Amino acid sequence: LSYCTYGGIPRNKITEFYGEPSGGKSTTAIDICKNAIDIFQKEFDAKVEALRKSAASGNKSANAELQDILDCGPKKVLYIDLEHSFDGAWSKTLGIDETRIEIMQPPDVFAEDILQTIQDIIETGEMGLIVLDSIPSLVPKSELEKKLGERTVASLAGLLTIFFRKVVSLLTRYECTLLTINQIRDNMDNPYVIKTPGGQAPKFYASLRIYFRIGHPVDFLGNELPQSAENPAGYIVNARITKQKSAPFDRKNG
């Protein structure tokens, strides 16, 4: 995927992962969190070293800026787990230290409140990466207050349109990247067209979209097994880039 995306997801932009259940979306997102933590720490250390050299040469403004940066620390990573499926043991297996990542698992909270909280967090300037897992788990107030069987029309789509329109410029201003995870739904009108929840806004505002699906099962040596294999060691994940606005769109399959 790093090769297909020309070095990873675009910074200070919106990226969307979508696809089948157990297709590798959340695992890939956690791996990105791990890489982001290391990158932010290296950038912080390099900036501190440069400012210390500048301050040592008598630059008073550099000394003040150095103190501000030391107070804030490196950019942070926030994982918003609306599905309450984040596994600390699994993330540790993937190489991520739980003490270096912020995990938010809100209870039954309105989608309006969660989206506003994300906007407020971006505006603090402290976050370098926010993962929203997942869009279909956002429940608008109008939907949460209705009984089962009562329908609401495009309430989440309307909320997301407003949200993405507001945060797309904030991400650039505060140097924060937003990674959203989405699911797919059966499309009764056209089974050959993939349908995702949340309306058109997640697709429109994303600079990068990647579609994940499960491939062949494999054994512990990485050899492909028949689809009927009962206890495979894992599965090959097929990822296809369906939108790319931050790099050449010539590497679509990973």
What is the predicted role of each segment?
Residues 38, 72-74, 94-101, 146-155, ...:
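A short alpha->loop->secondary-structure connector
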Residues 92, 142-144, 190-192:
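Short acidic, glycine/serine/threonine-rich loops at helix termini
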Residues 121, 153-254:
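Phosphate-binding/switch region of NTP-binding enzymes
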Residues 81-83, 134, 182:
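Glycine-rich, histidine-containing beta strand-loop boundary motifs that form or position
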Residues 85, 137, 186:
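Residues immediately C-terminal
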Residues 76-79, 102-104, 129, 179, ...:
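Short hydrophobic alpha-helical runs that function as membrane-insertion/retention elements
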Residues 1-100, 118-119, 123:
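The Walker A/P-loop phosphate-binding site
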Residues 66-69, 106-176:
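Phosphate-binding/switch loop-helix module in NTP-utilizing enzymes
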